[in-house]
Amino acid sequence: MRFDPEKIKKDAKENFDLTWNEGKKMVKTPTLNERYPRTTFRYGKAHPVYDTIQKLREAYLRMGFEEMMNPLIVDEKEVHKQFGSEALAVLDRCFYLAGLPRPNVGISDERIAQINGILGDIGDEGIDKVRKVLHAYKKGKVEGDDLVPEISAALEVSDALVADMIEKVFPEFKELVAQASTKTLRSHMTSGWFISLGALLERKEPPFHFFSIDRCFRREQQEDASRLMTYYSASCVIMDENVTVDHGKAVAEGLLSQFGFEKFLFRPDEKRSKYYVPDTQTEVFAFHPKLVGSNSKYSDGWIEIATFGIYSPTALAEYDIPCPVMNLGLGVERLAMILHDAPDIRSLTYPQIPQYSEWEMSDSELAKQVFVDKTPETPEGREIADAVVAQCELHGEEPSPCEFPAWEGEVCGRKVKVSVIEPEENTKLCGPAAFNEVVTYQGDILGIPNTKKWQKAFENHSAMAGIRFIEAFAAQAAREIEEAAMSGADEHIVRVRIVKVPSEVNIKIGATAQRYITGKNKKIDMRGPIFTSAKAEFE
């Protein structure tokens, strides 16, 4: 809270120790639900794949490569030019783009009657306007998502009525079937490189060093732990009349060394794609220490991580490219799996989807989901809660029956005296579980005493909810006393006995934590004898 510096300086000159000690009053005391760890500073996290993409971009730029964006939509004729006799096999794994045809819609007398029945009598002029908009749609002058607004604007009727009219009067719109085009989504970055390099030569002279990191699409038979139908390719090219296979080896080492790879093996690729010069297509195997001993088939530290080769003159000639081109590519997701210790590409890419990813909440995250249910709403109510806790701390071991005054003052316009009491004989003011604390430990939410037995559970302060049973009870008592003051009651007693569930001691668990604990067969265990009461007497 704010304070007056001049007054503080004056008071400090008169009595420094007193002023220093009273500095505590200048610091706001958080309410139970404002305590750490519920008060937290959240931070954004980059997605592992995009994080890896950014690191790859920086790595390529450091090596002197210039970034380029290649065409994503590629006509099948380009695939034939690039892959030759392999084109059909490549196209078999491509996604073709399709679109809905635009029907030639006629308006008969029967349909005119239906239109007038839905929109009201729009007359011959209105029907003619509908005809013109439908004709413009057929010719491609009006887009599909503009059809309803265009008719609505022409007739000055609501979009909802027009949409209803189209659905009921023109059922052919609902019966449209998509028709495939010759356009495909690229399955290899290579498809884009040929187009880009061929076009660039009209304006620039080689040598060129380019890289591109972008999506590719491949119609896999199924997705699994190592394959997705859409993935990111981190690809580069060097166009230079003197480029060789050794340039590919050098680029592989220079790029991958920046990600912790230490040793490299280069092996001829058995695939022998027709867009590469024979015997230049090379697989890159690299050693990464993070893989050693991992629970994967790469536990020896070695993994196939990239492929490079020299583009074939027969493919380059189709684009009038007169220079050799070295191309290297790697899958971003595979690299991201190594950097982020991910065993499954699906869970790495789509961690939010339950079928792909195990749900994990840390003890710290669970602790943030623990709250006090009823809390006082006035400053006086908060003072009452603090006073009840203070008396229980001072006199909790006192034998009963007993009563200790806790607070006296005015609440909601009424004078009140608050005491902590235990009327039963042969017990104590507070039961043995009164000072249990709420902690999360190994996925469980527990109410336990801070004793040697539970020492491990209290080592992580971020997993401690910062709530004791007695504090939650005192908050409920204070809130009920506020309500009693407003209702005109003469006396109000709040009791807590043996607690079996969190709600019996005024504690609630967030719905997310409850779902997680139920799904993981973990437990919420808050039990124990608290046995104390707070009494309010109003004047």
Swiss-Prot record:
The keyword Transmembrane does not apply. Its EC number is 6.1.1.27. Substrate binds at H188, M189, T190, S233, A234, S235, Y275, Y276, N327. GO terms for cellular component: cytoplasm. The keyword Protein transport does not apply. It holds the Pfam family SepRS_C. It is an enzyme of class 6 (ligase). This is O-phosphoserine--tRNA(Cys) ligase. It comes from Methanosarcina acetivorans (strain ATCC 35395 / DSM 2834 / JCM 12185 / C2A).
